[in-house]
Regions:
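Mid-domain alpha/beta scaffold segments of enzyme catalytic cores
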Residues: 1-254
């Protein structure tokens, strides 16, 4: 059993072949799919996905940092409304993204901190999006750290030191296609990180692993990431799959 801890299965890129794509994933051994939220415009398609695959799909709720704009308080109200009326398995994806634009830096910080507090109140894990913002994300995590806070640093692409810092905040590292890239860098030090801190993800339809880089990603390709971790850790395919799936259960509680 392999767990994809971060996949956008509701993406319009899967519109034409979603059932076939899901079957390919299951044939490859990927049987658990955790679905991050972006903003209110995606809620309906996420709920439909859960209805279509009730035994396979586990939803998160949250406001993505690139969706934080002038109306972010309305978006946060939408997140809270849904958290109050339905079961979700994490709050995410949340965090900070300064790659595209720093206009709403303060608002991103506020949204991140607010959603972390909701997660702690509800004893839910968080799923962190961090792009060009490690210092800013760590600053918020430092101010909010507690025994009740746990989660995943989605699509981790930092340094060894940043990996250790993320782990110190009770975060697992979400490892996906980037680990297979020649210039991905994280594969150079992953063997220094205990496998108990690692979970698997695709971030599909983005960041397809080698040899599919540049193409649409899908959950079936997670086996390529497992193969890479087999090389790095010297364990069997089944051992990597079992350990990382157990790690995901430790985070999500299911």
């Amino acid at each position: 059993m392999i767990t994809d801890t971060h996949t956008h299965l509701y993406s319009s890129q899967f519109k034409e072949d979603q059932p076939a794509m899901m079957q390919r994933a299951k044939d490859a051994g990927v049987t658990r799919f955790f679905i991050p939220a972006i903003d209110s415009t995606y809620t309906d398609v996420m709920l439909q996905l859960e209805e279509d695959y009730p035994k396979d799909v586990f939803l998160m709720m949250g406001l993505h940092p690139t969706s934080v704009g002038e109306n972010y308080l309305e978006e946060l109200a939408h997140v809270k409304e849904w958290l109050d009326k339905k079961k979700f398995y994490a709050i995410g994806e949340i965090g900070m993204d300064l790659y595209w634009d720093k206009t709403f830096l303060t608002q991103q910080q506020d949204a991140f901190r607010t959603q972390i507090q909701w997660a702690k109140e509800r004893k839910l894990p968080i799923n962190i999006h961090c792009r060009d913002a490690f210092d800013e994300v760590f600053e918020v995590l430092e101010s909010e750290k507690s025994d009740d806070l746990r989660g995943i640093f989605h699509c981790f692409t930092g340094t060894l030191e940043q990996a250790k810092q993320a782990i110190s905040y009770n975060m697992k590292l979400g490892i996906g296609g980037v680990a297979t890239f020649k210039n991905g860098k994280i594969d150079k030090f992953l063997n220094e990180i205990d496998l108990k801190h690692i979970v698997l993800e695709t971030d599909a339809p983005y960041l397809a692993p080698t040899p599919y880089r540049g193409k649409r990603n899908e959950s079936a390709y997670l086996t390529n990431v497992v193969d890479k971790l087999v090389d790095i850790y010297g364990l069997s395919f089944d051992e990597i799959a079992a350990i990382t799936t157990q790690n995901s259960k430790d985070v999500f509680g299911i």
